[in-house]
């Protein structure tokens, strides 16, 4: 049964009438950089140390009686998200774990280019999460007169004080998305993110529609941080006429895992014996190869066509309807937790925190 909670216009005030007055929540903002923190320079937009912290003081809505308290921690240096690595994921996750008992929720200001990767990684690293972690950013910097940053900031903070949300999300342009289902879909539009294979958790307009039945339920187990150890894994996207020698070179490296981005429902050429043999040999050596569709919508079904069945016979496992970003991060996470290949394969095909459906 679908359960949708509606809040109406002027949402902080009418919230009291709908749910009763919320207790004042304490939110920690982690500012990692990105467009939201950028100012114009001679080299284009670059994140500017101290700018966001100063600018937030001038946003009147943030001092509204029904908005949560917030504290902002700014990273130094601030990063364009193109420069994000596993080290930054570990730092963000560790900061959340360190302050976990002191705050009711966490908002992360982040660049848009790799936000889906960071959200996916955090969803696995923050085990048994029972507080909201919301990533947001903007397509136009907060430093510009016309920007999308202010609404994203205000609404992220407000949603972060809404009790039923206890998972890693992305909030962007009136939509709350599960973090490990999200993908960046536009470099130009304010509607920069979507979750093609999963409904929005909330839609924000005059009415605020929170789809409570879609929200992850806490496991009841103690919160635990699992940092990620960098492993030699790769994503390889197929294209018509690709050179098998390129894949051969990649598979000669000491790989632990490969995300193979295939056509349609998980298909690849089956008329090139060397290609299939390369994959089979790698699987036999203990390389975990995950079949992930290039299509934003739909799922991998390796029994549907002969071209998919050949990959299954070679030893590939199904990525089901996971995004390439979530598949990559989940593989890193599982390889860190357990070195047993069969264990990793088993858990790759299980939903750990809402990242896939069978």
Placement of each model-derived feature along the sequence:
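ATP/NTP phosphate-donor binding region
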Residues: 23-98
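Accessory alpha-helical/coil subdomains and C-terminal extensions
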Residues: 24, 30-34, 40, 52-64, ...
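Short acidic, glycine/serine/threonine-rich loops at helix termini
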Residues: 40-43, 119-120, 145-148, 178-184, ...
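Short Gly/Thr/Asp-enriched flexible loops that form oxyanion-binding sites at enzyme active sites
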Residues: 108-131, 270-278, 307
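Short, acidic/small-residue loops that bind anionic groups at enzyme active sites
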Residues: 119-150, 157-163, 282-293
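Internal gly/pro-rich beta-alpha loop/helix module
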Residues: 135-205
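C-terminal non-catalytic interaction/assembly regions of soluble proteins
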Residues: 265-358
């Amino acid at each position: 049964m679908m359960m949708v909670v509606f809040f109406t216009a002027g949402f902080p005030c009418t919230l009291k009438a709908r749910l009763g007055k919320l207790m004042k929540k304490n939110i920690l903002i982690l500012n990692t950089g990105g467009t939201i923190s950028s100012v114009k320079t001679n080299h284009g937009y670059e994140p500017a140390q101290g700018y966001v912290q100063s600018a937030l003081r001038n946003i009147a809505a943030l001092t509204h009686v029904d908005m949560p308290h917030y504290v902002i921690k700014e990273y130094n240096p601030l990063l364009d998200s193109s420069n994000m690595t596993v080290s930054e994921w570990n730092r963000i996750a560790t900061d959340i774990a360190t302050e976990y008992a002191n705050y009711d929720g966490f908002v992360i200001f982040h660049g848009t280019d790799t936000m889906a990767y960071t959200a996916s990684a955090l969803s696995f690293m923050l085990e048994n999460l029972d507080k909201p972690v919301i990533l947001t950013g903007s397509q136009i910097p907060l430093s510009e007169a016309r920007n999308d940053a202010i609404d994203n900031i205000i609404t992220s903070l407000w949603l972060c004080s809404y009790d039923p949300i206890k998972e890693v999300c992305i909030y962007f342009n009136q939509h709350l998305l599960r973090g490990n289902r999200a993908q960046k879909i536009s470099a130009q539009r304010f509607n920069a993110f979507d979750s093609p294979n999963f409904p929005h958790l909330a839609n924000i307009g005059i009415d605020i529609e929170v789809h409570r039945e879609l929200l992850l339920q806490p496991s009841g187990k103690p919160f635990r941080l699992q940092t990620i150890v960098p492993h030699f894994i790769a994503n390889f996207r197929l294209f018509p006429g690709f050179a098998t020698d390129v894949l051969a070179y990649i598979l000669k490296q000491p790989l632990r895992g490969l995300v193979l981005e295939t056509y349609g429902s998980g298909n690849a050429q089956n008329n090139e014996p060397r290609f299939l043999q390369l994959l089979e040999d790698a699987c036999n050596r203990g390389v975990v190869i995950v079949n992930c569709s290039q299509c934003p919508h739909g799922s991998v079904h390796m029994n549907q066509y002969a071209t998919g069945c050949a990959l299954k016979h070679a030893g590939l496992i199904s990525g089901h309807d996971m995004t390439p970003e979530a598949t990559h991060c989940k593989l890193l996470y599982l390889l860190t937790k357990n070195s047993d290949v069969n264990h990793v394969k088993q858990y790759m095909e299980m939903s750990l925190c809402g990242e896939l459906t069978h």
